C-alpha cells in the first residue's frame, strides 16, 4: 500500500455485481466482485486517473472527478477495461470532490479544502453543468456549452 490517499469514490454497476473504485494517489481504477471480493485493476491502456475522487456510473460511462476537472471513461460491458476520454472543467468549480447525475446534468460538489485553516465560506455550493457530448463518441468535442447553472 502506498502512502497518501488510496481507495476513493465508489460506485456499483447497474446489475450490482461489481463495485468500481479509484486509487487516488496512483490513478488506477479497480473492479471488485461483490460476491467473492476478487479485485482486478481495470485495464485503461495508457490512460490513468490520478487524483481521482468522486465517481458516477451511467451504463458503461464512468464520470471521474479529479484534479479540478471531470473526466469521462467508457468501460467495456464486463467493466474489466476502458478508455479514458475527454476531461472538462467549469469556472464554477472550486476544488470539486464528487458528483451525481440529474437528468442531463452533472451536479458537482465544490469542497472547501482551501479553507482548512479558517472558517468556510457559506453557503457551500454545488455546480450544475450539462453533460458534455451526450450521445457522442469519446474524444468528440462537445457542442454543449458548459455554462454553470444552465441545467
Task: Name the predicted role of every residue range.
Residues 27-29, 70-72, 115-116, 126:
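Structural signal for beta-propeller blades
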Residues 138-151:
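Ser/Thr-rich, Proline-interspersed low-complexity disordered segments
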Residues 1-2, 38-45, 83-89:
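A short beta-strand motif characteristic of beta-propeller blades
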Residues 1-18, 45-65, 91-103:
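Beta-rich, blade/repeat-based domains predominating
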Residues 33-38, 74-80, 130-132:
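Short loop/turn segments that connect beta-strands within beta-propeller blades
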Residues 8-10, 25-51:
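Anionic-ligand binding region
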Residues 122-135:
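Beta-propeller blade signature
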Residues 12-14, 19-25, 62-68, 108-116:
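Conserved beta-strand positions in repeat-built beta-propeller and related beta-rich domains
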Amino acid at each position: 500500500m502506498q502512502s497518501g490517499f488510496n481507495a476513493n469514490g465508489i460506485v456499483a454497476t447497474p446489475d450490482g455485481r461489481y463495485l468500481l473504485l479509484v486509487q487516488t494517489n496512483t490513478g488506477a481504477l479497480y473492479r471488485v466482485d461483490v460476491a467473492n471480493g476478487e479485485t482486478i485493476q481495470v485495464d485503461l491502456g495508457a490512460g490513468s486517473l490520478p487524483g481521482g475522487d468522486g465517481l458516477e456510473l451511467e451504463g458503461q460511462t464512468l464520470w471521474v472527478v479529479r484534479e479540478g476537472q471531470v473526466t469521462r471513461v467508457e468501460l467495456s460491458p464486463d467493466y474489466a477495461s476502458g478508455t479514458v476520454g475527454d476531461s472538462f472543467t467549469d469556472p464554477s468549480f472550486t476544488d470539486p470532490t464528487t458528483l451525481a447525475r440529474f437528468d442531463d446534468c452533472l451536479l458537482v460538489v465544490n469542497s472547501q479544502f482551501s479553507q482548512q485553516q479558517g472558517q468556510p465560506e457559506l453557503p457551500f455550493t454545488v455546480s450544475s453543468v450539462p453533460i458534455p457530448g451526450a450521445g457522442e463518441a469519446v474524444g468528440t468535442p462537445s457542442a454543449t456549452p458548459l455554462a454553470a447553472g444552465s441545467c
